């Protein structure tokens, strides 16, 4: 059927010309020119797709002859048919019939060689779109490769890729190798569909010339493939195809971004560029707040972000991670080589922690080094290797274990290189011999090797490291650090006895409590006893699990935590009915578990492992059950201690309160121009996080691979939990929120709550009221509550704990009012509060929230801390002030001075005075620690929120009580300055920048800059003469949580970054040198890769890295989002009035600093891929920022910054995004990518524009293909 464009008469003329040429054997060129004139006179647009289809259809196979091929080739040469369309028409006809017609196959490849590499004429031709659509209709490329947009550039890419693929399959088929491929057959037609007996007979009767031609054809096909791979245009097109084509038969190649030398940032592997890891480690060691997020997950994302941004190998990334973890331990004056032996050999008892107080101890620091860090590494390796799970899930041999990716090899190399840091791993000479024997025993135990002669003298600790790592790698636990195996020598026999079935005698139990388990099997054995053993055995297991295995069993710590959380939620019996909770029957067992996990270090360890939401979900049912019943039943523990439901409830409830900032003063919510950044932790929030994690876990290949590490004997319920399931807890929380937000509602006389309040007041002030009755009138407006000294209220107070908590705010209000009016003395008030807290320790939470809210409301007159009515700070207040000044000396921050009569006139708000007076009545021991750690952070934040010098006064009172805590308390007090003074925060940030960059050294340490200058010797390092000056980074880590409005930090950090860049340029680039670098031979304005700029660029990257870390640590995801959406666009729009200093180098360096700052901040918050939960927010914010960028480039937005800064920022940002975070580009709107690429081309950034399009996926693949052709044509 004739093409529609041709009239019948014209069609007949063309047919006649073809037949005449074949019959008369005319010159093909003469025939082609004559045909061109005929078509032109008929008004046919050339080249003509319809003519190409007609010619190919006419020739194959009825008129197939050598002359026909010559006519076709000349038709292409004189441009009357599109070359690529002819090739597309020939491919499905010739290649499948190559064995029947080897000559045709040869001629087809000759046409490929001549015309398959010329794309520019096609792209510029007016019929480009029509031609490519015709090719798609013929070869069905859109359907084959999933090209949805059907852009001509995308079809062109698919066509080139299909040609190479067809040639490759044909060559493999000729050599009999096609069956060895994964699909066993070609994706394309490789044999004729109309093969008949004649064809087979002809195939059998091939002569030697025929065979030789086939062999020559195979050789030519391979040469053509090689040419496609070497040609400048087609090689880039093929690379683009392999990067974006979604097909199981196309292996995705690694992405290598092509970035112009004028726009690529100078990336270095300087160790200082890993500084964010050190800051992160210090930040997670702050124990004042339990984090709902997992430190392991956050560290995983951080390391991946830095590895991508620094363009380093995984070996360098993991080595930097290990060294940062080691520095964390050493900054706390804990020598790692001592710490292991401290718990093993008990010979270094003289070693002491650097600072005493309610702060993380040795075990927590080692948890970061030996548990959190290895788990983060395991996550990274599992992400890489999880891609093989689905492919080998049906394999009985678990072949995935044999596939080692780059991450795993990088880990092994980094561990091997740690041997260069022998000083960190070598024990003191005094214990060298014992240490070597310990190392040998550890190797023998882990490896299962026995030594017949018992001699270990020739084994060293370094060998222990190597042996342990090899063994643990083979088991794929990935939890072995260089010296982890050493602690396993401690009383290994006690765990061996358990595994052999020995009963848990008291002596064996004590040994197991103090000796960490060495394997998951041992913990599973304990779990089995806890679920099936007797009551005494269950209690023994609870003590064992909360002992050394939890605190120092770093290789199995994550498993112990999960087992404990699971045991806190025992399943209900099948025959349970009614409202009675089955948890009551497990009271002694649960109490031991709850007490065991209450220490500061333990809660911190749970937080580091991200188990806080799961723990909250386990604690809420316990609180609901034990708080709802009357305490008529008591239980006796094996220690002889008598407990009631109130005791179990108080322990569980105070532990639950510590999991979020329940004491957060309302002041932090109502002051400032903006609300607090990020979600405010609450019971609902913790349950939401728990439900989401459990619902999502196990659905991704990475999670399924991670589950291989976990125990199979436990099955955690994934059913969602909501607050509605706990009505009494929900009622208390609603009252708690009301108490924090407003004054108490009126209490009705004669109500049940009124009677409970009366009974509690009678109990609290029984001694004070022996002389008669006393009226305590609360300020809330409730009726007068009378207490009588003669009433015995003990029977009346056998009430559910929730009922007592409901009445507690009214009790406190009445007591505080009575004290304010003089009806109660301060000492009597403190004594009464202590009686209430002893009766039900859970009321401490109510005291904290009530007193905090009352201080915030400011309705109470201050009281004089004169030593008569209230305790006096006079003994050491001046000393405390001096030491605060000493701590802040390096920052240049001014400390408010007390007036001359300040000591004698020291006052505190009445609620704060009552709370601090209560706390100093406690005796510090293990029994009260779990309750004081609830009050301590609240007291600290409450005092910090009050005017100066409330915090020094509180600190003075506590240092008088606990002198060994003085360093901790004074350091905490120094943070108050930053809570009240925004300028002090800015000065501290400035100190962080100048000290890290070594710009204005205030000490020999600061002159070198880097991590050591920023973080110094850690928190509270002590020398002779008391606590030392705090390094600015450590101080900022400790104070940023108390900054009321963190939104201003983005602008200040940005300003400090710009100032630092100017200082760097002034110091590193003299004006004369800068002028010489203004023009480089490649035509770009600035030469980033020049040697003269390398040092400056390293410092600029370090400054940007510091700034990004501070933004992320200070405000998390929301603050980074504000930086990208608001702060940066506002900065570029604003006029800064800067001069073109140093030949324009300062503006350029500022642009690159901003680019790295923006990319790194975003990578910290969102992650570099989609595995990070926060990555769901990334596309919207990134689109807004790129839309702003494109609009400014198109002239729709006027900029106020230096043009060189803007140009450097745009090219730098795009370069880093394409090279380091290519996954981001795939999430951006295709049209924005195309517009941005077009603007970059206008700046002569052709390669960068191309790299951006190449990273844009299928949506920009067509535009990238066309740009490849145009760019190569220009060159």
From Swiss-Prot:
Chief place of localization: nucleus
Tissue: Ubiquitous.
Effect of residue 361 to H: Partial reversion back to wild-type phenotype
InterPro entries referenced in this protein's UniProt entry, alphabetically: MED33A/B (IPR039638)
Phenotype when changing residue 357 to S: In ref4-3; Semidominant dwarfing and decreased accumulation of phenylpropanoids. Reduced phenotype. No effect
Gene Ontology CC, one term: mediator complex
Keyword list, A-Z: Nucleus, Phenylpropanoid metabolism, Repressor, Transcription, Transcription regulation
Disrupted gene: phenotype observed: No visible phenotype.
Signal peptide: none
Function description: Component of the Mediator complex, a coactivator involved in the regulated transcription of nearly all RNA polymerase II-dependent genes. Mediator functions as a bridge to convey information from gene-specific regulatory proteins to the basal RNA polymerase II transcription machinery. The Mediator complex, having a compact conformation in its free form, is recruited to promoters by direct interactions with regulatory proteins and serves for the assembly of a functional preinitiation complex with RNA polymerase II and the general transcription factors.
Name of this protein: Mediator of RNA polymerase II transcription subunit 33B
Native organism: Arabidopsis thaliana (Mouse-ear cress)
